[in-house]
Design a protein with these regions (language model features):
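Predominantly flavin-linked oxidoreductase catalytic cores and closely associated redox partners
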Residues: 4-116, 133, 149
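Generic detection of short hydrophobic beta-strand segments and adjacent strand-loop junctions
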Residues: 14-15, 127, 227
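Short secondary-structure transition/capping segments
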Residues: 31-41, 91-102, 168, 172-173, ...
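Electropositive phosphate-/nucleotide-binding environments in soluble metabolic enzymes
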Residues: 41, 71, 75, 98-99, ...
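Mobile, glycine/GP-rich and aromatic-enriched active-site lid/loop segments adjacent to catalytic centers
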Residues: 73, 82-85, 90, 113-125, ...
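FAD/FMN-dependent oxidoreductases across multiple families
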Residues: 96-178
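C-terminal helical "tail/cap" subdomain of flavin- and related membrane-associated enzymes
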Residues: 174-268
Length: 268
C-alpha cells in the first residue's frame, strides 16, 4: 500500500502497488519505515535564502558561483553564493547542531554585500553524506536519490545522482516484474556503486581530510589553484568518473596533498 497526499486538494488516497520506489528525499519516511538502519547515516543541514539579485558589483558577479570556506560561516562544510539570473541563492551547510544557520547566512550576506537585497524565500533541507548500505527491503521497496543517500561528498551535488539512481531503481523494478522475483531490487545499489563508488570514496576522503579546520580548508583552496587539479576535477565532474589521463599530473597532485596534510608547506 502506498499513501499519496495530493497537495492541491489535501486528499489522501490509497494505492495498491506491487513495488514502491522511495524517492521522498533525505530522511525518507519510506526508508525509515521499510529499510533497516536507514536513519544511521550522517547529514549536513543546508540552509539558503533566495534573494533578488543586485546588479554586478565589486563583490557580486552574476556570471560567477562563489564557494566560501570560512569557519565563521561553516566550521565543517562551506557557504555559497549562486546566481540564478534575476535571483541568487545565498546559503551554507553544517553537520553541527551548535551552528545557527540563519545567523551564519546573514553574516555571509553581509560579507558578500548582499544584506540589503530583498529576500524572496528561505529554505532548509538535510543533505546525506554517504549512500545507505542497503537500498531495498528484499520485498517490494527500493530507494533512489537523496532517500538512498546519493549526494556527492565535498560538493553536495545530488541532482545528477538522483536522476541516474532513479533510472537504476526503475531498471531493477522492471527486472523484478519481468522475472517475478524481488531479488533483483539489489541491482539498483549494485549498479550505481559499480559506476560511482570510486568518485564517492575520493570525495569523501577529501572532505574528511580538508573540511575539518580553517587551516585545512585554506590548504584545499591552495590546491585548487593548481591548473592540473582544475583540469582533472573538471573532467571528472563532467563525466562523473575519475579522470585517468595525465598520470604525471596525478602523481604531482598526490605529493602536493601529502605536503599539505603533513604541514610541509604553507597555504597561500
Amino acid at each position: 500500500m502506498c499513501i499519496r497526499d495530493s497537495h492541491s486538494t489535501k486528499k489522501i488516497s490509497t494505492l495498491l502497488t506491487r513495488y514502491v520506489i522511495g524517492a521522498d528525499g533525505a530522511k525518507s519516511n519510506v526508508a525509515r519505515n521499510t529499510i533497516k538502519d536507514a536513519h544511521k547515516i550522517p547529514y549536513v543541514i543546508a540552509y539558503h535564502e533566495i534573494i533578488e539579485a543586485p546588479r554586478e558589483t565589486s563583490e557580486y558577479n552574476p556570471d560567477r558561483c562563489d564557494v566560501i570556506y570560512n569557519g565563521d560561516i561553516s566550521p565543517d562544510f562551506y557557504g555559497w553564493v549562486f546566481p540564478h539570473g534575476k535571483s541568487a541563492s545565498v546559503g551554507m551547510g553544517t553537520g553541527l547542531n551548535s551552528v545557527n544557520l540563519k545567523k551564519a547566512t546573514s553574516a555571509l550576506r553581509t560579507q558578500a554585500g548582499l544584506d540589503k537585497c530583498s529576500t524572496i524565500r528561505k529554505e532548509g533541507a538535510p543533505i546525506p553524506l554517504k549512500p545507505l548500505e542497503r537500498w531495498d527491503n528484499g520485498d517490494n521497496v527500493v530507494l533512489a536519490g537523496d532517500a538512498a543517500g546519493v549526494v556527492a561528498p565535498s560538493s553536495g551535488e545530488g541532482i545528477y545522482y538522483a536522476m541516474i539512481g532513479g533510472k537504476y531503481a526503475a531498471d531493477a523494478v522492471e527486472k523484478c516484474l519481468l522475472n517475478g522475483h524481488s531479488k533483483y531490487l539489489t541491482l539498483a545499489r549494485r549498479n550505481f556503486m559499480k559506476e560511482h563508488k570510486a568518485v564517492f570514496q575520493v570525495l569523501g576522503a577529501m572532505q574528511n581530510a580538508y573540511y575539518r579546520s580553517d587551516d585545512r580548508r585554506e590548504r584545499f583552496v591552495t590546491l585548487c589553484k593548481d591548473i592540473d587539479v582544475q583540469r582533472i576535477t573538471f573532467e571528472s565532474y563532467m563525466h562523473k568518473k575519475l579522470s585517468r589521463s595525465r598520470p604525471i599530473a596525478h602523481l604531482k597532485i598526490m605529493f602536493k596533498n601529502i605536503a599539505h596534510l603533513t604541514g610541509m608547506v604553507k597555504a597561500t
